UniProtKB/Swiss-Prot annotation:
<dbReference type="InterPro" id="IPR036709">
    <property type="entry name" value="Autotransporte_beta_dom_sf"/>
</dbReference>
<dbReference type="Pfam" id="PF00082">
    <property type="entry name" value="Peptidase_S8"/>
</dbReference>
<dbReference type="Pfam" id="PF03797">
    <property type="entry name" value="Autotransporter"/>
</dbReference>
<dbReference type="InterPro" id="IPR036852">
    <property type="entry name" value="Peptidase_S8/S53_dom_sf"/>
</dbReference>
<keyword id="KW-0378">Hydrolase</keyword>
<feature type="active site" description="Charge relay system">
    <location>
        <position position="58"/>
    </location>
</feature>
<dbReference type="GO" id="GO:0004252">
    <property type="term" value="F:serine-type endopeptidase activity"/>
</dbReference>
<keyword id="KW-0732">Signal</keyword>
<feature type="domain" description="Peptidase S8">
    <location>
        <begin position="25"/>
        <end position="407"/>
    </location>
</feature>
<comment type="similarity">
    <text>Belongs to the peptidase S8 family.</text>
</comment>
<dbReference type="GO" id="GO:0009279">
    <property type="term" value="C:cell outer membrane"/>
</dbReference>
<feature type="domain" description="Autotransporter">
    <location>
        <begin position="669"/>
        <end position="932"/>
    </location>
</feature>
<keyword id="KW-0720">Serine protease</keyword>
<dbReference type="InterPro" id="IPR015500">
    <property type="entry name" value="Peptidase_S8_subtilisin-rel"/>
</dbReference>
<dbReference type="InterPro" id="IPR005546">
    <property type="entry name" value="Autotransporte_beta"/>
</dbReference>
<dbReference type="InterPro" id="IPR000209">
    <property type="entry name" value="Peptidase_S8/S53_dom"/>
</dbReference>
<feature type="active site" description="Charge relay system">
    <location>
        <position position="351"/>
    </location>
</feature>
Length: 932
C-alpha cells in the first residue's frame, strides 16, 4: 500500500513492500490474483468489467508501459497553494521518488522511478502476456475504462531531489524514534493534523478524487492510508475524535461527494501488522452514512492466511474483505540513461489487494449492470469465502473475495434494498436477508437458491422464487412466481398482481400466517403436460396450523396444454387448501334451450372471478364436477324471466289496442250519448310444462261519447299489474296506459276504427338459487302504439254481427336492466317494433225489457305477429354472454270472449269471461264493468 508521504518522511515510511526484483524473466513463476479469487479464464472472458468506469487515486502510473490497458485515461488537474503556487497534477507525467541511503560519510539520496500507481492499475486492467514468466494473466477487469489521477504535481528530477534535501535537513533536528509518539503522529496525520503542510496534502488528495468523480466513475481504488496508530480501537477513536467536527476538511468533503454520487471507495487497510486498519478504512465508524459506499481491503498470502504485513479488518470488519497481496505487478526501472525499462516485479502489500477488490467490483457491475453500487458491494462482501473464525470476524471481515460465487448473485443484503431489474436474470446463490427486498423493473428475476427472507415487495416485473424459500412477509403488486414458498406471517396482493405457481405446491402458510389473494393466477404449463381429467395439477395454497386465507383471483391464465384437449382447469377453494384440478365441461343432454344456454354460461363462468374465490358458487362447482349434481343451476342462471316478461308486455300492449276496439263496439251500440264506465279484470295463466304462473290485475276508467250517429270517441286510462312466478325467479310488471279510439261508420254498413296507445311501464325482477340471491333489479320503459281497423256490420233478426280486420304497429322500449347480486345479469336497453294482423268478429243480441235491456255477446280475436316468433334477449354475467328466450310464445294468440250486458234506465253493467289460447298457456280472464 502506498503510504502518504512527501519525497520521504521518517514518520511515514513506504508501506508497499517490494521485493524489487528485476524485470521478470521467462523462467520466473508469476503470481497472478485470478486463481486465488476464483476468476477462471472462461469467467474472465465472459465478464471483464467491460465499459465500467473505475478510478485510481495514486502516483507513478508509467502510462507508457506496454502492458497497460488501452482503456487507460490519465487525468490532469491543478491546485493553487496558499502561497499562490499553481501546481499541475498530470497522471501521464513520469514521476520520481528518492530513497535515503546511509553511508559512512552521510546520507545519499538515490532517485528512482515512482511505479506504485502502475502496479495498482495493472492489477485492475493490464493486458495479459503469456510470454512473461510462466504466464502473466494481466488485470482482473481488462475491459474497464480506467481513469487515473495523481497526487504528485509535475516536478523535474532536480526539483524532487532539491525538495528531498530540504526535508532531510528539517528531519535532522527531530528525535529519531523507532515508534513516533501519538502527538507526533497527530502532527503528521492526514486527517487529524492541523499543520499547513498536511492541509495542502489533504487538498491534493481531495483534488484528485474530485477529478475522478467528475468522470462519473463507479468505484475508486485508494491504495493509500495513514498509519494505523494502535491495535486498540479505543485509542484510535480518541485520536480521531476531532475529525467529526471538521466540516471544512476538503478530503472528507470529497469522500462525502463520492457517497452522494453513489461511487464506491476501496481503501487499503495498511501494512503495519496492526489489529486495526488505517483511518480511511475506518471512516464509516465515524460517519455511518459512508458504510454503504466503502470497502476496507486486507491482504492474504498464497496460503489464504492473513499476510504477515497486513493490518486486520478490526473495527471495519462489517465492510471489509480480503484479497491476495503478494503479486507480480507492472514496473519500470530506469537504465543508465534514466529511461524506463518495462516489465514485472513481485511486490507485497494491501496496496495490491485493494485493486483486486476494485477490479472485482467492475466484473460484478458488468454481470449485474442493473444493481446499485451498494448492492454490488454487498454481493462482493456476502459471497466471500469465510476465513478464520466463522462469520464476519476481526481479521478477515467477510473473508476472501470469490468471483466464481459472486457472479451467481448476492447471498445477503445488508440494508433495505430495491432491485430494479432491466433484463431477465437468475441468481443461484442462497439468499438470506433480515431487511426488506423490493423488486422493481419490468423484467424477471429468478432466485434459484434456498432463500430465507424477511420482507419481499414485488412492485414491478416478475420475481420467481424457484428455490426453496421461507419468507415472513410478501406484498405482491406485480408478478410473483412461487414453488413451495413458505409464508410465516403474511402474503398480500393487489388487483393488478399475478401469482404464478411453478411446482406442485405454490404458497404454504405456516403458523398463524394470513394469505390475502387478489389479482390473477397462472399455473405453469409444464404442470399440465400429461394431466388428464380428474388430475390435480397443483396445490395453489396450503394452510398449516392456524393459518388462514381470504380473497380470490380475478383470472386463471388459460393453459395451452388443456385448451388444445378441450379441458378446463378449475380451482377448488377448500378449508385448508386451494387446489387446481383438470376437468371436462359440464353437460346435460336433457336440458332445453334455456338450460343449454345456462350450461354454456356456467362453463364460461368457470374462467371468471366468480369461480376463483371461496363462495357458494365455488362449492356448487366442486359438487357439480365431482358428483355431477347440477341442482338445476343451469336453469336458475337463465334470464328467461325477463324474456317471458317482455313477451307478456308485447302481448299485453297488443291486447290493450284490442280492448279499445271492444269499448268502441260497446259504446256504439249503447243508446246513451255519453257513458262513463269503470272496469276491473283478473287473470291467471298457468303453464305447468314451462313452470310459469302469471297473475294479471287490471283496472280501467273510461269515457265514451257519440258525436253523431256515425262517430264515437272513446278514452280509457288503465292500471295493470302482472306477477310472474318461476321456480328460480319472480317478476312484477306494472303499466299505466292511455288508449284513445275513434269509430266512424261509412256508407253501406262499413265502418272504420283508429286507436292510439300511450303507456309507461315499471319492471322489477329477482332471481334466486336455494338461499342465494342471484340477482335483483328494476327498470322502466314506454310504449307507443296504434291500430287501424275496417269492418262490416250485419244486423239480421236483431243480431249484430261485425267482422273486422285490424293492423297494429307497436313500439315497446325498456331501459337497461342491470342486476345486483352474486350472479347478476347485465342486459342492455331493448326496443321492439311489432306489426300485428288482428282479425276479429263480434256477435250481439239485445232483448228489450220494460225499463232496459239485456244483451249477451260473443267475441273472437286472433293475433298474428309478423316480425319475430318469440322474445329473445342477450345478457351477460361476469362478462360472459347469456342467451335467454321466453318459454311461452305469444306471437300467435286466439282470444274468445263471452259476456252479458244489462241496461237499466241510465245504468249499465257487464260481466264476461275471457279465454285466451297461446302455446302451452290457457289464461282465463274475469271481467266486470259498471257503466253510467
Amino acid at each position: 500500500m502506498y503510504k502518504i508521504k512527501h519525497s520521504f518522511n521518517k514518520t511515514l515510511i513506504a508501506i508497499s513492500i517490494s521485493s524489487f526484483l528485476s524485470i521478470a524473466y521467462a523462467t520466473e513463476s508469476i503470481e497472478n490474483p485470478q486463481p486465488i479469487i476464483q476468476l477462471s479464464e472462461s469467467l474472465s472472458s465472459k465478464y471483464s468489467g467491460k465499459g465500467v468506469k473505475l478510478g485510481v487515486m495514486d502516483e507513478g502510473f508509467m502510462v507508457k508501459h506496454p502492458r497497460h490497458s488501452s482503456h487507460l485515461h490519465p487525468l490532469i488537474h491543478q491546485l493553487t497553494t496558499p502561497e499562490g503556487e499553481v501546481r499541475i497534477y498530470d497522471a501521464s507525467y513520469p514521476q520520481f521518488e528518492v530513497n535515503p541511503v546511509e553511508k559512512e560519510d552521510g546520507i545519499d539520496l538515490i532517485p528512482s522511478l515512482e511505479t506504485h500507481g502502475a502496479g495498482v492499475a495493472g492489477i485492475i486492467a493490464a493486458q495479459a502476456d503469456k510470454t512473461l514468466g510462466d504466464g502473466y494473466s494481466g488485470g482482473i477487469a481488462k475491459g474497464a475504462e480506467l481513469y487515473v489521477a495523481t497526487k504528485s504535481y509535475k516536478r523535474t528530477l532536480e526539483k524532487v531531489i532539491q525538495d528531498a534535501k530540504k526535508e532531510l535537513e528539517n528531519a535532522k533536528d527531530e528525535e529519531d524514534e523507532k515508534t513516533p509518539s501519538l502527538d507526533q503522529m497527530a502532527k503528521n496525520d492526514l486527517l487529524a493534523s492541523k499543520e499547513k503542510e498536511m492541509a495542502i496534502e489533504r487538498a491534493e488528495w481531495a483534488s484528485g478524487l474530485n477529478k475522478l468523480l467528475d468522470n462519473n466513475v463507479f468505484a475508486i481504488n485508494n491504495s493509500w492510508n495513514p498509519f494505523s496508530i494502535s491495535d486498540d480501537i479505543n485509542v484510535v477513536d480518541k485520536f480521531y475524535q476531532s475529525i467529526k467536527q471538521n466540516k471544512h476538511n476538503p478530503l472528507l468533503q470529497a469522500i462525502m461527494r463520492a457517497k452522494n454520487s453513489n461511487t464506491l471507495l476501496v481503501f487499503a487497510a495498511g501494512n503495519e501488522s496492526k489489529k486495526q486498519p488505517g483511518v480511511m478504512a475506518l471512516l464509516p465508524r465515524y460517519f455511518p452514512e459512508l458504510e454503504k459506499n466503502l470497502i476496507s481491503a486486507v491482504a492474504v498470502d498464497k496460503e489464504q492466511k492473513i499476510a504477515s504485513y497486513s493490518n486486520h479488518c478490526g473495527a471495519s470488519k462489517n465492510w471489509c474483505v480480503a484479497a491476495p497481496g503478494d503479486l507480480h505487478v507492472l514496473i519500470g526501472v530506469a537504465d543508465e540513461h534514466k529511461k524506463p525499462q518495462y516489465g514485472l516485479t513481485k511486490e507485497q502489500g494491501t496496496s495490491f489487494s485493494a485493486p483486486a477488490i476494485t477490479a472485482s467490483l467492475a466484473v460484478l457491475k458488468e454481470r449485474f449492470d442493473y444493481l446499485t453500487a451498494t448492492q454490488i458491494r454487498d454481493t462482493l462482501l456476502t459471497t466471500a469465502t469465510d476465513l478464520g473464525e466463522k462469520g464476519v470476524d476481526n481479521v478477515y471481515g467477510w473473508g476472501l473475495i470469490n468471483l466464481k460465487k459472486a457472479v451467481n448473485g448476492p447471498t445477503q443484503f445488508l440494508n433495505d434494498e430495491t432491485i430494479t431489474v432491466t433484463r431477465d436474470d437468475h441468481w443461484s446463490n442462497p439468499l438470506a436477508s433480515q431487511f426488506k427486498i423490493t423488486k422493481k423493473g419490468d423484467k424477471s428475476l429468478h432466485l434459484d437458491g434456498e432463500n430465507h427472507l424477511d420482507t419481499v415487495a414485488v412492485e414491478e416485473g416478475r420475481l420467481a422464487l424457484n428455490g426453496k424459500t421461507k419468507v415472513k412477509t410478501i406484498s405482491n403488486h406485480a408478478n410473483l412466481a412461487v414453488n413451495g414458498t413458505e409464508v410465516e406471517q403474511n402474503y398480500s396482493s393487489s388487483g393488478q398482481s399475478q401469482l404464478e405457481v411453478l411446482g406442485k405446491s405454490g404458497l404454504i402458510a405456516n403458523a398463524q400466517a394470513n394469505i390475502h389473494l387478489a389479482g390473477s393466477l397462472k399455473i405453469d404449463d409444464k404442470l399440465t403436460e400429461k394431466t388428464e381429467a380428474g388430475d390435480v395439477s397443483a396445490t395453489v395454497v396450503q394452510l398449516k396450523d392456524k393459518a388462514t386465507y381470504q380473497g380470490g383471483f380475478t383470472q386463471l391464465v388459460e393453459n395451452e396444454n388443456l385448451a388444445k384437449r378441450g379441458l378446463i382447469q378449475d380451482l377448488y377453494f377448500k378449508e385448508s387448501e386451494i387446489i387446481a384440478k383438470v376437468n371436462k365441461p359440464l353437460t346435460d343432454e336433457k336440458a332445453d334451450t334455456n338450460g343449454q344456454a345456462g350450461l354454456a354460461l356456467l362453463n364460461a363462468l368457470r374462467t371468471t372471478p366468480i369461480a376463483y374465490r371461496r363462495s357458494w358458487y365455488n362449492g356448487w362447482l366442486q359438487s357439480a364436477l365431482e358428483q355431477r349434481k347440477l341442482d338445476n343451476l343451469h336453469y336458475a342462471v337463465s334470464n328467461n324471466i325477463y324474456a317471458d316478461s317482455l313477451e307478456l308486455l308485447r302481448s299485453q300492449n297488443r291486447k290493450g289496442l284490442t280492448q279499445a276496439q271492444q269499448h268502441l263496439f260497446t259504446a256504439y251500440h249503447t243508446p246513451l250519448q255519453t257513458t262513463v264506465w269503470a272496469e276491473h279484470l283478473n287473470q291467471k295463466q298457468s303453464a305447468s310444462s314451462k313452470h310459469t304462473d302469471v297473475k294479471h290485475h287490471q283496472s280501467q276508467l273510461g269515457v265514451n261519447h257519440k258525436l253523431a250517429d256515425k262517430t264515437v270517441l272513446s278514452a280509457t286510462l288503465s292500471q295493470q299489474k302482472n306477477r310472474l312466478e318461476k321456480p328460480f325467479a319472480q317478476a312484477t310488471l306494472k303499466q299505466t296506459a292511455l288508449n284513445i279510439g275513434l269509430r266512424y261508420h261509412l256508407d253501406n254498413a262499413w265502418f272504420s276504427e283508429a286507436t292510439l296507445q300511450f303507456a309507461r311501464q315499471k319492471y322489477q325482477q329477482s332471481r334466486r338459487f336455494a338461499s342465494h340471491q342471484l340477482g335483483t333489479a328494476e327498470t322502466r320503459g314506454s310504449t307507443l302504439g296504434g291500430e287501424m281497423r275496417i269492418g262490416y256490420q250485419f244486423m239480421p233478426n236483431q243480431w249484430i254481427i261485425e267482422p273486422s280486420l285490424g293492423v297494429q304497429w307497436i313500439q315497446t322500449k325498456m331501459n337497461g336492466l342491470n342486476e345486483s347480486g352474486e350472479l347478476a345479469t347485465q342486459t342492455a336497453a331493448m326496443r321492439y317494433r311489432d306489426v300485428n294482423i288482428v282479425p276479429s268478429v263480434k256477435l250481439q243480441r239485445t232483448f228489450q225489457l220494460e225499463q232496459g235491456s239485456i244483451s249477451p255477446y260473443i267475441g273472437l280475436n286472433y293475433l298474428h305477429r309478423l316480425n319475430g316468433k318469440i322474445t329473445k334477449i342477450t345478457s351477460n354475467i361476469a362478462g360472459k354472454t347469456l342467451h335467454s328466450e321466453a318459454t311461452t310464445k305469444r306471437n300467435r294468440q286466439l282470444n274468445g270472449e263471452v259476456g252479458v250486458k244489462l241496461h237499466y234506465k241510465n245504468w249499465f253493467t257487464a260481466m264476461n269471461l275471457d279465454y285466451s289460447r297461446v302455446k302451452s298457456c290457457k289464461p282465463i280472464w274475469l271481467e266486470s264493468k259498471c257503466w253510467l
